[in-house]
Curated annotation (Swiss-Prot):
Lineage: Eukaryota, Metazoa, Ecdysozoa, Arthropoda, Hexapoda
Phosphothreonine modified-residue sites: 58, 61
Subcellular location: Cytoplasm
Protein name: Translationally-controlled tumor protein homolog
Keywords assigned by UniProt, alphabetized: Calcium, Cytoplasm, Phosphoprotein
Length: 172
């Protein structure tokens, strides 16, 4: 299994256990599912249940959301109220990624520059339909993943988008 981590923050963003596709050699699209998890209170083994207070069965907790977001502890980010603020973030973030690429993978620089401009225009064109998520550290200097809901075979499917060159693969 491969874990994909943000090259700036080191946050775990997703794993290759999900259906995914590489678009224009710069964006990973990861297909998620809406899920609800339920968990009970922790019970100590060997405890005498009759000596405890009566359990009313109402202590079940649940969390709902996109499986990729929940499993990798991504946090929704509300920092981008308009296209202009997101564009400023993208330009700054892309400079950081470009500096890392020039240092570690100079052969990828031209691919990144050429294809990223097209991808950015496409993303900015759909800005109002997107949700934004940071890694567990909630550091907006790192990668901000995008979530868009798309109609696929009659279902609304959450599709997460991650910038390929802003990730490092780690084999587990």
């Amino acid at each position: 299994m491969k874990i994909y981590k943000d090259i700036i923050t080191g946050d775990e963003m997703f794993a290759d256990t999900y259906k995914m596709k590489l678009v224009d050699d710069v964006i990973y699209e990861v297909y998620g599912k809406l899920i609800t998890r339920q968990g009970d209170d922790i019970k100590l083994e060997g405890a005498n249940a009759s000596a405890e207070e009566a359990d009313e069965g109402t202590d079940i907790t649940s969390e709902s959301g996109v499986d990729v977001v929940l499993n990798h502890r991504l946090t929704e980010c509300f920092a981008f109220g308009d296209k202009k603020s997101y564009t400023l973030y993208l330009k700054d973030y892309m400079k950081k990624v470009l500096a890392k690429l020039e240092e570690k993978s100079p052969d990828q620089v031209d691919i990144f520059k050429t294809n990223m401009n097209k991808a950015m225009k496409d993303i900015l064109g759909r800005f109002k339909e997107l949700q934004f998520f940071t890694g567990e550290s909630m550091d907006c200097d790192g990668m901000v993943a995008l979530v868009e809901y798309r109609e696929i075979n009659g279902d609304s499917v959450p599709v997460l988008m991650f910038f390929k060159h802003g990730l490092e693969e780690e084999k587990c």
